[in-house]
Amino acid sequence: MSDSATSPYDGTVERTADGGVIRFERHLAYPIREVWDAITQPERLADWWLPFDADITVDLREGGEMVMVATGDEPMTVTCTILRVEPPMLLEHTHAEPGSYMRWELESIETGCVLRLSHFVTDADAAINNCYVVGLHESLARLSPCLAGQPVPWDWDEFAAAQAHYARLGLASAAT
């Protein structure tokens, strides 16, 4: 099965009084429950979400934590707090950037489900300069292969291609 989005590069940034919102929408040819599991179960998240290997734990309740501990040469721990959880349709959690948070909304449709991801940031320009749109794009590009049982590794060449595309749109910094 495969996914289809309105465009292969469909990330957008909306500037708001509070900073901004990065948005993605994916139409996935998988049942909502499978997609929910892929965004909430540690072993599934590890297959597609991060650009590095990590041990992930998820306490899937409001106030619970999602903890990602890098297992590579550079130690790093990212802890997010779960703000809202309404299985299998809504997950909202903080992000590593203070004051920002992410909202995952799933909608069941006849052909699978629609995933709407919104990343609320405090500074849209900083998010653009730090290539948040590109990182989200690349993570989401790995979701369908994961759902198909064929996870793919992070591809830095694909990241560079997406970065060049989004930079032309003013939604990412240019590669240096």
How does the language model describe each region?
Residues 23-24, 42-79, 88-90, 156-164:
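Short beta-edge strand/loop motif at the mouth of beta-sheet-based domains
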Residues 26, 79-84, 101-108:
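Hydrophobic/aromatic beta-strand elements that line small-molecule binding cavities or substrate pockets
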Residues 92-145:
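Beta-strand/loop substructures that line and gate deep hydrophobic ligand-binding cavities in soluble
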Residues 18, 85-87, 109-111:
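Structural motif
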Residues 1-55:
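Hydrophobic ligand-binding cavity/cleft-lining segments
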Residues 19, 73-75, 97-99:
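Glycine-centered tight beta-turn/hairpin loop motif at sheet-sheet or coil-to-beta transitions
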Residues 145-176:
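Short, highly charged C-terminal tails/helix-capping segments
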Residues 13-15, 57-59, 81-84, 106:
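Short, exposed beta-strand/loop patches in secreted or surface proteins that constitute
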